[in-house]
């Protein structure tokens, strides 16, 4: 919640924090359900943690939910800062608080997954995930996939590297794919630098209207 206690609602998507029931309890219940009913190879949890902006870049500030306020007050005897200000001494304590909360949640997440299946790959533990993407107003690097895969795999090409080719043009254009040559180039760069073929789309394969990414990426997936 924001400093006024309002829920952060972005077009029906509610932002949560690691100290709320959804991330602490429900997310693990959902994870346990899907991992015991479907044959997954690995897990990547996207955008968990303490988010302060929404997809449109609107700043909402630190979470002021009752759990966060209570825990921070118990540990530091302070109120949560109104805004993110690294120059504020209280904010530095809040940053430490967030780091500790995130670490605890991560430990519970890993424990849950390992109990279900020790062979499941977990992001940032068993493999490293990066992205090759475009965004409005951001300079483009045509060899992004090569750089990411090579950096992650290491000089001996021993570390599992998952560099996801992002289908969409930018968060404000999430339903429109970048060009087919761009998408194909990323996948072949991944393979040439000891990475895996990896595609990131919004939604799921069955209802994805712009099929450009699927068609362009298929030859690399077939080859791999």
Where are these regions (language model features)?
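Active-site-adjacent "subsite" loops/lids of carbohydrate-active enzymes
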Residues: 1-38, 47, 68-99, 107
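Aromatic-lined carbohydrate-binding/catalytic grooves of carbohydrate-active enzymes
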Residues: 1-11, 52-68, 119, 125-128
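Hydrophobic targeting/anchoring helices
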Residues: 41-46, 52-55, 83-96, 100-224
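Generic detector of bulky aromatic hydrophobic side chains
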Residues: 47-48, 60-62, 69-73, 185-191
């Amino acid at each position: 919640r924001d400093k006024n206690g309002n829920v952060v609602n972005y077009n029906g998507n509610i932002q949560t924090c690691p100290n709320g029931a959804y991330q602490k309890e429900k997310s693990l219940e959902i994870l346990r359900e899907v991992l015991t009913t479907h044959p997954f190879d690995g897990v990547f949890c996207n955008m968990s943690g303490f988010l302060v902006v929404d997809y449109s870049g609107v700043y909402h500030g630190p979470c002021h939910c009752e759990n966060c306020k209570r825990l921070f007050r118990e540990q530091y005897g302070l109120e949560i800062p109104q805004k993110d200000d690294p120059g504020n001494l209280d904010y530095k304590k809040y940053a430490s608080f967030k780091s500790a909360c995130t670490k605890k949640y991560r430990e519970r997440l890993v424990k849950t997954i390992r109990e279900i299946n020790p062979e499941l790959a977990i992001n940032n533990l068993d493999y490293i995930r990066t992205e090759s993407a475009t965004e409005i107003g951001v300079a483009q690097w045509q060899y992004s996939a090569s750089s990411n895969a090579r950096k992650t795999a290491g000089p001996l090409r021993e570390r599992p590297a998952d560099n996801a080719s992002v289908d969409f043009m930018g968060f404000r254009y999430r339903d429109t794919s970048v060009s087919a040559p761009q998408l194909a180039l990323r996948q072949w760069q991944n393979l040439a630098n000891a990475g895996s073929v990896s595609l990131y789309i919004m939604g799921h394969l069955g209802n994805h209207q712009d099929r450009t990414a699927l068609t362009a990426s298929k030859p690399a997936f077939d080859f791999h």
